[in-house]
């Protein structure tokens, strides 16, 4: 009897051990399945976020097209009747759609904390400042046009002031498929110049942009025309041409009556299912205003800057830009962005007659909320001769709190041209936004 009990116990032990060993692979399989399910859920969340942005953009397009359709239907049914003032009245459909003052309004703020080895009491050095506050307005004017305006305020060290950053009227549907814009806008050159400061990955514009066009890039009053160029390869090929007021931009005469002309050509290539490449070319022409040297009675010379400007088209700027995008699983993304500019000019205004510069930026968004990157700058500046160059390295880290707020941390190591002292700076920037903004913070 005891033998039977012992045999039964042995068989039961072997059976349980066998089942436990068989269960181990099943548990591992379940763990792997759970991990894959979690990855799939994260991917779905990222896709839902992208779809939400797409739907919002499409709703804006549908709203504008509905206004156009309503206007066209009314134009077919009834001709516009003259008003008491003798000016033709808008069709009733358009009046209902755009008659009221109901623009999209947004407020965007940028606050910066900066520590630097630079001992000058310049704006923002070793201080916390409200770098900029933007007030944005945009609205469809009628079925054929819209208006956009950006007014900025700053907490300047010397004088607080308001500035019209952009205010322009857009008219689409012009002959031959052109779209026109008139007013004040950011010049359509390269990549970074088109962006407002809070849209940049870094806390400041690249050195070559600041040296050639100003600390905030080039924005000026003028006229812009854009169109798509048909081609046998069926590639997206866009060209824009601008005539800008000449009193802006460090490289030009600074005189309103001598305009700046520029063109920008860009194309887009879908290299693989997960990668694409955007290429662009820029040309700019403008006047210099070299001083007139006058001989005094005592034998000395005086340099006089002439108000009418001289040296027609003495400034020629050429540039190229290349942006590579790589879309990774789970919403991750790598961006490699590069811009190069060089000038051909006399040395009568600035010390350097062949200034040039470039930057290369690599940005890695490794999660929905975080990204990091580094920007390298090289600049052979306008006002330093002898072929001396400025180099700078700027690693940064960004926390994307939401579409409407972000926080940036950046360190910049700069070796200036001309033997000046090396500078190290640290920045902490917070961007925040309320309202309906046409370009998101992120």
Q: How would you label these PLM feature ranges?
A:
Residues 225, 399, 422-442:
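Outer-membrane beta-barrel "beta-signal"
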Residues 116-123, 158-168, 194-198, 250-257, ...:
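Outer-membrane beta-barrel translocator domains and adjoining extracellular loop/strand segments
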Residues 1-8:
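Bacterial N-terminal signal peptides that target proteins for export
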Residues 8-17:
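Bacterial N-terminal signal peptides
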Residues 90-249, 255-274, 278, 283-285, ...:
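Outer membrane beta-barrel
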């Amino acid at each position: 009897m005891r033998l039977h009990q012992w045999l039964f116990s042995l068989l039961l032990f072997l059976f349980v051990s066998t089942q436990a060993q068989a269960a181990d692979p099943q548990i591992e399989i379940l763990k792997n399945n759970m991990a894959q399910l979690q990855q799939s859920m994260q991917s779905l969340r990222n896709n839902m976020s992208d779809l939400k942005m797409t739907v919002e953009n499409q709703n804006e397009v549908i709203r504008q097209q509905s206004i156009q359709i309503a206007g066209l239907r009314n134009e077919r049914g009834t001709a516009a009747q003259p008003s008491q003032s003798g000016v033709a009245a808008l069709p009733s459909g358009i009046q209902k759609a755009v008659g009221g003052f109901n623009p999209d309004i947004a407020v965007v703020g940028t606050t910066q904390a900066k520590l630097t080895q630079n001992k000058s009491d310049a704006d923002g050095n070793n201080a916390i400042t409200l770098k900029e506050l933007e007030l944005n307005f945009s609205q469809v004017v009628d079925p054929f046009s819209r208006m956009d305006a950006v007014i900025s305020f700053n907490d300047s060290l010397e004088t607080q002031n308001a500035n019209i950053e952009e205010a322009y009227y857009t008219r689409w549907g012009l002959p031959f498929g052109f779209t026109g814009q008139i007013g004040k806008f950011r010049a359509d050159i390269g990549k970074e110049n088109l962006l407002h400061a809070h849209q940049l990955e870094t806390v400041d514009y690249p050195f070559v942009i600041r040296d050639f066009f100003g600390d905030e890039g080039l924005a000026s009053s003028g006229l812009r025309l854009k169109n798509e160029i048909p081609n046998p390869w069926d590639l997206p090929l866009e060209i824009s041409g601008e005539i800008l007021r000449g009193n802006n931009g460090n490289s030009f005469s600074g005189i309103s009556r001598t305009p700046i002309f520029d063109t920008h050509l860009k194309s887009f290539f879908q290299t693989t299912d997960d990668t694409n490449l955007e290429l662009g070319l820029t040309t700019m022409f403008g006047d210099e205003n070299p001083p007139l040297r006058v001989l005094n009675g005592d034998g000395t010379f005086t340099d006089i800057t002439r108000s009418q400007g001289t040296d027609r088209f003495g400034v020629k700027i050429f540039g190229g830009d290349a942006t590579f995008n790589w879309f990774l699983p789970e919403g991750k993304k790598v961006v490699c962005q590069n811009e190069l500019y060089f000038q051909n000019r006399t040395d009568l205004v600035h010390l350097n007659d062949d200034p040039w510069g470039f930057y290369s930026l690599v940005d890695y968004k490794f999660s929905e909320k975080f990204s990091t990157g580094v920007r390298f700058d090289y600049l052979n500046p306008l006002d330093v001769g002898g072929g001396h160059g400025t180099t700078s390295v700027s690693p940064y880290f960004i926390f994307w709190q939401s579409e409407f707020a972000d926080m940036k941390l950046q360190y910049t190591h700069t070796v200036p041209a001309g033997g000046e002292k090396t500078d190290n700076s640290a920045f902490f920037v917070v961007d925040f936004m309320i309202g309906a903004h046409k370009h998101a913070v992120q």
